[in-house]
């Protein structure tokens, strides 16, 4: 080891002592304060410094840092050198402009110059009285002399002792002024590395390094030099092909920080189970007398990385203008940003702390990442000894706990909370909102409120959350409402007045009090006798159609799980509803497998009306309700069992609103206390019996709820709309009586007249010129439904008759539903010009009694059809059975049924709603994705423990799927070959699954010339097409499982249903769209070949000649030139700029 122990006896003056112990300026130190290293600065003040035993110095090594950087360990170097103390740490410095080889001795308080070196100085100063120093050979006489020391651009003037000793020593006084520091390398040799493996079929990242600016490059080199000297990185081997790019950012302190983009490496690593599933909560801490919070410094850089895995972490330091070859390094310790660094660190620290936990089971020791909490109930001295022992255990393994982050007095900052011996709080935070907030700003605000709600009871976010509706982009501006601002101010007031919360007492029971706010948010507090332990909130899912009791029962399960997680015990619940309501919810056979202990209050929530609903018919009156909508007008009606009928015109409402209003009318008009309501609206029946949630007076369902409250019992039943039920048919007819009183029409070219005028005006669809004696048929987009016992008459207008325009429109009977065409003849003496929008004819409705017509039925197609006068149609009723059979076999969609069997869409939808499998369908995820012919998406899904690989063409929605025996590269490659054989794909988009990014699959797609993309390059929902296809395919498979013996057979039947039994673009099936696209591609190729193969001729001019030649046949045409056979020069190429192409001459 180095000779470093000359004990200097300080007898010099206080002035010299002060001069020798002064701290070097902070700006003169190299930037070694990054998170990647822990450094110990040497000072002369022995009271503030800690001695480092020789044994530890032998392990850790010494590093001196100043300005500049270099590599190696020759005596001429000084900065960025690591000494392992196998030989003396020496360097060359200029003393009085004389180069001298000196020993660096951090154990010496004072620097000493040898007599020989003193005699070699180019110039020497005066001699002053020195002090005696005690060395190995006894007391040594000295004198002092002023010197000037230069090293790496640093100049210092001081005094040195001169003595007859073997070697010149630079002690701590001069080393400190030169900017040297003692750095203890923290890569622990005591900790065993953990094995890291790559996923099967993957390889390490090979991403090139992007350029860095000169300023960032200098910062990176400085950091890398320090990491290299500390042993945290090493030079990469010459045969290492891997690389992940680095970038450098400047911190607020102005110092650089080096980061590495390890995202591609993280994708290839085999990741285990997460062992840290959440943050510890102060409400679960047991109250203790003494607390201490510690922070572990540079935790990742203490743990060694698996040597076999280190090559995959390689990175590159480039140079400006390629001045020198790039320098490449690999990590020896856990790098920041690596997916397994948190797991390995926490697991390693857990094993280190386990003996301490077993030795002191009564001590609360919480470990989360690099934050430690220690709580005990012993004496203050005993607690301090525990902390010393714990820090020693960590230090022995290489983990340091810096003094500046050691919290021994309250309040303690821990994981965003403020701890005191008697209570705890959320760290104070003022909730603010910018003037024009974006979606990102509001989301951050909501996150802060949610975080603080556990420590500040009563915080709400309903109105703030409402401002984000309809916003998709993070930078999209939101409309900040007055309600949201008021809610924010109320939350700030609650935060300002918040009191400290208590710690858990294991000797007492806990009580959870649940309340519902005016904003329909459920808030709760967990209490003991000493006060509130923690609080929380949950927005009730009213929009999900869940009842209040169902919401609160879910909340109880959530709170019970949260409480068991934090303290290992479930509280007793005090809830704002009655026991009867809970029992009613339980009787519905819902999902509750466990019910906590509940204390019921007298408060009754809004959905007490549900107690009036029964499962069996009552002895009271039965009312059949129905609602409909056509031509923008809604009709609500009902028929009672005693023959009473009522209809009501609702105006422009939806069909569902009409159904709901019919039920409301029936309940309002019935005075009976026991009522049976029968509806054909599955939507209304499902909502009333199960779906309605927290409904207030502003809800459209509130009148129905209020009327149910006034009854004793109410029975609701649902029947399909076309099952031949007498009462339902009567209600259906009643809903049409009001509708048929007036003319029903569609179109934009029909205008209503004044109240005192008869009929309607018809308008010209576009500008038309009618010559003299010419007859034209003018089409319109007007369709009408003539009332019963009436007919329509198209005739002219007096204003047009003056100009000589004769209208021969004709009679429209009540069976015709096609578009109206008007026959016009110019009998005048000049041409007549009709302008778009001009009123040129009129339609008058007249009654007649010559024909006996049946009442209007919206579910009937005209006998004439829609092709004009004289055409005939067919009734669709006889096709219902065939459509039902079709749907039972193939689960065809409503639009395809309506198109194939010529039945109304409403009837087709009713057939679909009756199917128990198809009623479960919902809408898939929405979003903009890349769609084009022959662009496919692929994904693997699982059903019945089997793997299904799904391909879906993004343009048509055509699905191809196959079963895989294993989800690996080989099986995926075989499936891709089969897919490529059947189709002609140009591109494929998948996720980052191991089977899709495996090297064999990537190479196969390259060989097939299929462009392959992964991840989310186009949109965060770029997998939306195939995910939606997977869900649809699974639903169709389940629909066919009853009729098949194997999953393979059900899969093939489901593919037929998905591709040929549901609508896609423009009402066509995916199969029809796909075939049409392929035919179009083939047609375009044939046209291109035909165009290229056709004979072309041209005139041409040879460069250097003035006369045009030709015409002659073009032998070949390229993008920039043509090839012709010139009479004089033979076959030559002529630029297109000197040619004139033409068709074959006669």
Swiss-Prot record:
Keyword Chloroplast on entry? no
Enumerate the residue ranges forming zinc fingers (Integrase-type): 878-919
Q: Which UniProt keywords apply?
A: Aspartyl protease, Cleavage on pair of basic residues, DNA integration, DNA recombination, DNA-binding, Endonuclease, Hydrolase, Metal-binding, Multifunctional enzyme, Nuclease, Nucleotidyltransferase, Protease, RNA-directed DNA polymerase, Transferase, Viral genome integration, Virus entry into host cell, Zinc, Zinc-finger
A single Gene Ontology biological process assigned to it is: proteolysis
What are the Basic and acidic residues biased-composition ranges? 45-59
* Boundaries of every Integrase catalytic domain copy: 921-1078
Name the PROSITE patterns for this protein. ASP_PROT_RETROV, ASP_PROTEASE, INTEGRASE, INTEGRASE_DBD, RNASE_H_1, RT_POL, ZF_INTEGRASE
All copies of the Peptidase A2 domain together span 100-174
Q: Does the keyword Magnesium apply?
A: no
Listed under catalytic activity are:
Endohydrolysis of RNA in RNA/DNA hybrids. Three different cleavage modes: 1. sequence-specific internal cleavage of RNA. Human immunodeficiency virus type 1 and Moloney murine leukemia virus enzymes prefer to cleave the RNA strand one nucleotide away from the RNA-DNA junction. 2. RNA 5'-end directed cleavage 13-19 nucleotides from the RNA end. 3. DNA 3'-end directed cleavage 15-20 nucleotides away from the primer terminus; 3'-end directed exonucleolytic cleavage of viral RNA-DNA hybrid; DNA(n) + a 2'-deoxyribonucleoside 5'-triphosphate = DNA(n+1) + diphosphate
Cite the InterPro entries for this sequence: Aspartic_peptidase_AS (IPR001969), DNA/RNA_pol_sf (IPR043502), dUTPase-like (IPR029054), dUTPase-like_sf (IPR036157), dUTPase_trimeric (IPR033704), Integrase-like_N (IPR017856), Integrase_C_dom_sf_retrovir (IPR036862), Integrase_C_retrovir (IPR001037)
Active-site residues (renumbered): 105
Instruction: Give the residue ranges for region: Disordered.
Output: 13-77
So what EC number does this one have?
A: 3.4.23.-, 2.7.7.49, 3.1.26.13, 3.1.13.2
Name of the protein described by the UniProt record: Pol polyprotein
Q: Which gene encodes it?
A: pol
């Amino acid at each position: 080891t180095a000779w470093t122990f000359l004990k200097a006896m300080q007898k010099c003056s206080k002035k010299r002592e002060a001069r020798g112990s002064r701290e070097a300026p902070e700006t003169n130190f190299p930037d070694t304060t990054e998170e990647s290293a822990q450094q110990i600065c040497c000072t002369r003040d022995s009271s503030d410094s800690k001695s480092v035993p020789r044994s530890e110095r032998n392990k850790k090594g010494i590093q001196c840092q100043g300005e500049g950087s270099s590599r190696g360990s020759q005596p001429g170097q000084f900065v960025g050198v690591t000494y392992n103390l196998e030989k003396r740490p020496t360097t060359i410095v200029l003393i009085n402009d004389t180069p001298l080889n000196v020993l660096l001795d951090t154990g010496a308080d004072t620097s000493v110059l040898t007599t020989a070196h003193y005699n070699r100085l180019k110039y020497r100063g005066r001699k002053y009285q020195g002090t005696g120093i005690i060395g190995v050979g006894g007391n040594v006489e000295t004198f002092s002399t002023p010197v000037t020391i230069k090293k790496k651009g640093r100049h210092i003037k001081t005094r040195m002792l001169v003595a007859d000793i073997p070697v010149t020593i630079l002690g701590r006084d001069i080393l400190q002024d030169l900017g040297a520091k003692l750095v203890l390398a923290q890569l622990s040799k005591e900790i065993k590395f953990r094995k890291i493996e790559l996923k099967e079929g993957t390889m390490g990242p090979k991403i090139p390094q992007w350029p860095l600016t000169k300023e960032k490059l200098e910062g990176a080199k400085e950091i890398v030099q320090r990491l290299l000297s500390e042993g945290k990185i090493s030079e990469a081997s010459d045969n290492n092909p891997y690389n992940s790019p680095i970038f450098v950012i400047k911190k607020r302190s102005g110092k650089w920080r080096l980061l590495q983009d390890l995202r591609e490496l993280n994708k290839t690593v085999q990741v285990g189970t997460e062992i840290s599933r959440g943050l510890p909560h102060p409400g679960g801490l047991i109250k203790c007398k003494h607390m201490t919070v510690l922070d572990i410094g540079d935790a990742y850089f203490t743990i060694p990385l698996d040597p076999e895995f280190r090559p995959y972490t390689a990175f590159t330091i480039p140079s400006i203008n390629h001045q020198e070859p790039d320098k490449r390094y690999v990590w020896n310790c856990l790098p920041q940003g690596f997916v397994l660094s948190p797991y390995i660190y926490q697991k390693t620290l857990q094993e280190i702390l386990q003996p301490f936990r077993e030795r002191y089971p009564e001590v609360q020791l919480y470990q989360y990442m690099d934050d430690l909490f220690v709580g005990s109930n012993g004496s203050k001295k005993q607690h301090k000894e525990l902390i010393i022992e714990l820090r020693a255990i960590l230090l022995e393994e290489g983990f340091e706990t810096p003094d500046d982050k050691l919290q021994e007095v309250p309040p303690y900052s821990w994981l965003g909370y403020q701890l005191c011996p008697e209570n705890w709080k959320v760290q104070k935070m003022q909730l603010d909102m910018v003037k024009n907030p974006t979606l990102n700003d509001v989301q951050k605000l909501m996150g802060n409120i949610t975080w603080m709600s556990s420590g500040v009871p009563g915080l709400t976010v309903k109105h703030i959350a409402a401002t984000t509706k309809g916003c998709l982009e993070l930078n999209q501006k939101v409309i900040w409402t007055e309600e949201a601002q008021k809610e924010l101010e109320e939350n700030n007031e609650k935060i300002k007045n918040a009191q400290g919360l208590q710690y858990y007492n294991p000797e007492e029971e806990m009580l959870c009090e649940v309340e519902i706010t005016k904003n329909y948010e459920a808030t709760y507090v967990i209490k003991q006798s000493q006060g509130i332990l923690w609080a929380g909130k949950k927005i009730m899912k009213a929009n999900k159609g869940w009842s209040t009791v169902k919401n609160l029962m879910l909340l109880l399960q959530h709170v019970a799980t949260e409480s068991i997680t934090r303290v290992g015990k479930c509280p007793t619940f005090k809830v704002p509803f009655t026991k009867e309501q809970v029992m009613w919810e339980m009787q519905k056979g819902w999902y509750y497998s466990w019910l906590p202990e509940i204390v019921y209050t007298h408060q009754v929530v809004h959905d007490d009306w549900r107690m009036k609903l029964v499962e069996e018919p009552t002895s009271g009156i039965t009312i059949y309700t129905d609602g409909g909508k056509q031509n923008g007008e809604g009709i609500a009606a009902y028929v009672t069992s005693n023959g009473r009928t009522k209809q009501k015109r609702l105006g422009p409402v939806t069909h569902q609103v009409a159904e709901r209003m019919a039920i409301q009318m029936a309940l309002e008009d019935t005075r009976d206390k026991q009522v049976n309501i029968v509806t054909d609206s599955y939507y209304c029946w499902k909502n009333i019996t199960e779906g309605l949630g927290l409904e207030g007076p502003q809800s459209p369902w509130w009148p129905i709820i209020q009327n149910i409250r006034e009854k004793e019992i109410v029975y609701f039943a649902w029947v399909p709309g076309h099952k031949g039920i007498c009462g339902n048919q009567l209600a259906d007819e009643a809903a049409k009586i009001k509708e048929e009183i007036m003319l029903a029409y569609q179109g934009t070219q029909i205008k209503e007249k004044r109240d005192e005028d008869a009929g309607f005006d018809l308008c010209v669809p576009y500008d038309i010129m009618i010559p003299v004696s010419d007859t034209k048929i003018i089409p319109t987009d007007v369709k009408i439904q003539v009332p019963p016992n009436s007919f329509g008459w198209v005739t002219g207008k007096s204003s047009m008759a003056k100009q000589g325009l004769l209208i021969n429109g004709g009679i429209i009977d009540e069976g015709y539903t096609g578009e109206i065409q008007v026959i016009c003849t110019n009998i005048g003496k000049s041409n007549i010009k009709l302008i778009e929008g001009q009123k040129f004819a009129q339609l008058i409705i007249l009654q007649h009694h010559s024909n006996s017509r049946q009442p209007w039925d919206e579910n009937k197609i005209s006998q004439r059809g829609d092709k004009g006068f004289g055409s005939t149609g067919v009734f669709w009723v006889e096709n219902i059975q065939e459509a039902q059979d079709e749907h039972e076999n193939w689960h065809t969609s409503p639009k395809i049924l309506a198109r194939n069997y010529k039945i109304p869409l409403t009837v087709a939808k009713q057939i679909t709603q009756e199917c128990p499998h198809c009623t479960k369908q919902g809408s898939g995820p929405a979003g903009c994705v890349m769609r084009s012919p022959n662009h496919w998406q692929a994904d693997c899904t699982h059903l019945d423990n089997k793997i299904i690989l799904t391909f879906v063409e993004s343009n048509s929605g055509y699905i191809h799927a196959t079963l895989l025996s294993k989800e690996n590269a080989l099986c995926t490659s075989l499936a891709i070959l089969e897919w490529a054989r059947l189709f002609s794909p140009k591109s494929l988009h998948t996720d980052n699954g191991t089977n899709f990014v495996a090297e064999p699959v990537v190479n196969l797609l390259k060989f097939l010339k299929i462009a392959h993309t992964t991840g989310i390059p186009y949109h965060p929902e770029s997998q939306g097409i195939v995910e939606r296809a997977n869900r649809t395919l699974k639903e169709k498979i389940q629909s066919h499982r009853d009729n098949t013996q194997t999953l393979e057979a059900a899969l093939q039947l489901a593919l037929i249903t998905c591709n040929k039994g549901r609508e896609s673009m423009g009402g066509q099936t995916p199969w029809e769209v796909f075939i049409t696209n392929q035919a179009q591609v083939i047609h375009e190729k044939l046209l291109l070949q035909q165009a290229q193969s056709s004979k072309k001729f041209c005139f041409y001019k040879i460069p250097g000649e003035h006369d045009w030649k030709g015409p002659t046949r073009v032998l070949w045409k390229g993008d920039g030139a043509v090839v012709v056979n010139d009479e004089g020069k033979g076959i030559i190429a002529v630029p297109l700029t000197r040619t004139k192409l033409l068709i074959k001459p006669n």
